[in-house]
């Protein structure tokens, strides 16, 4: 995709966020809207993923540690083709698979369920270490909110010798 196409896609992701949060009459639109460009770039340009085979062994992984921004994550996954965009209107409804925090057992494309802030770093580091130990060729990315503690990154790596794990800070 060229830059203009990515910008248009990010705007569609934003529309999906607003639609989902409005339909649910609850949610955290600010964090989701601010992450739309990052999620769009990762899912449409950078990550090795296949919506038709979301559990493919050599796919890149993504961990949404700040699960309350799930509407942005869901909109990105829907626009990438993991599930129908129309399902965004079911956010937080009884019986919907799109609840307040992502659940890896029920949502196609979700690699890790989200819970308490900060838990995603350990999960992402574990995934990156597993890839290194297995000599696998996938990368792990994480969206993490760090309150009043900015993290210094060196070329996208949090810890030395872990394969391709980066933290996206907002």
Predicted regions and their residues:
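Hydrophobic/aromatic beta-strand patches that form the interior of the parallel beta-sheet core
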Residues: 141, 169-170
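Histidine-centered catalytic micro-motifs
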Residues: 29
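Boundary/activation segment at the start of structured domains
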Residues: 163-168
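N-terminal capping segment at the start of a domain
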Residues: 10-26
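N-terminal hydrophobic or amphipathic helices/low-complexity stretches enriched
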Residues: 1-13
């Amino acid at each position: 995709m060229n830059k203009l196409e990515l910008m248009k896609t990010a705007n569609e992701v934003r529309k999906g966020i607003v639609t989902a949060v409005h339909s649910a009459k609850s949610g955290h639109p600010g964090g989701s809207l601010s992450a739309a460009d990052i999620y769009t770039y990762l899912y449409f340009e950078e990550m090795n993923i296949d919506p038709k085979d979301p559990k493919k062994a050599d796919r890149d992984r993504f961990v949404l540690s700040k699960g309350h921004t799930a509407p942005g994550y869901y909109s990105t996954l829907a626009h990438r083709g993991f599930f129908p965009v129309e399902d965004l209107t079911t956010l937080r409804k009884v019986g919907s698979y799109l609840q307040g925090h992502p659940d890896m057992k029920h949502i196609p494309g979700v690699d890790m369920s989200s819970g308490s802030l900060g838990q995603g770093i350990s999960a992402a580091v574990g995934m990156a270490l597993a890839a290194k130990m297995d000599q696998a060729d996938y990368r792990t990315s994480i969206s993490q909110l760090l309150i009043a503690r900015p993290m210094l990154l060196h070329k996208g790596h949090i810890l030395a010798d872990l394969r391709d794990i980066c933290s996206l800070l907002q």
